[in-house]
């Protein structure tokens, strides 16, 4: 079960919208690996093609994932190898889409205390976020058991298929 996530932090600001996460000009495919190449392209050109983003954590400000309701946005993030997104707040539809595809996301009002390159650790089950670089610890609402099961399965569809198969 995915309980603890640890990775290098990449910082983004407030109101990162779905067009910045995966620009519409790249939506001519639904292949996650193709989408991954253009992850965050309009917010930080070339980000999705960096070698050092696998296993990393995006930390952002308010209203992450605002804009259109395209599911491609969290798919691009997950396929790029981002292990978790921490933000002060999320657009509701992005939040739901991320959970549906098994991308862990965490709301943390102190997200702005992280800096680019910090090492973060997220404990979904116990509700703790740590900035290991700065030695700080923050409490968050732990993921309920059913969300942990969705994350473990890899997303909502996979969870449902597993439940039907049992």
Swiss-Prot record:
GO terms for biological process: L-leucine biosynthetic process. It comes from the Bacteria. Pathway: Amino-acid biosynthesis; L-leucine biosynthesis; L-leucine from 3-methyl-2-oxobutanoate: step 2/4. Keywords: Amino-acid biosynthesis, Branched-chain amino acid biosynthesis, Leucine biosynthesis, Lyase. The keyword Amino-acid biosynthesis applies. One of its GO terms (molecular function) is 3-isopropylmalate dehydratase activity. Pfam families: Aconitase_C. It catalyses: (2R,3S)-3-isopropylmalate = (2S)-2-isopropylmalate. The keyword Cell cycle does not apply. Its EC number is 4.2.1.33. Catalyzes the isomerization between 2-isopropylmalate and 3-isopropylmalate, via the formation of 2-isopropylmaleate. PANTHER family: 3-ISOPROPYLMALATE DEHYDRATASE SMALL SUBUNIT 1, 3-ISOPROPYLMALATE DEHYDRATASE SMALL SUBUNIT 2-RELATED-RELATED. Heterodimer of LeuC and LeuD. Belongs to the LeuD family. LeuD type 2 subfamily. This is 3-isopropylmalate dehydratase small subunit 2. It comes from Thermotoga maritima (strain ATCC 43589 / DSM 3109 / JCM 10099 / NBRC 100826 / MSB8).
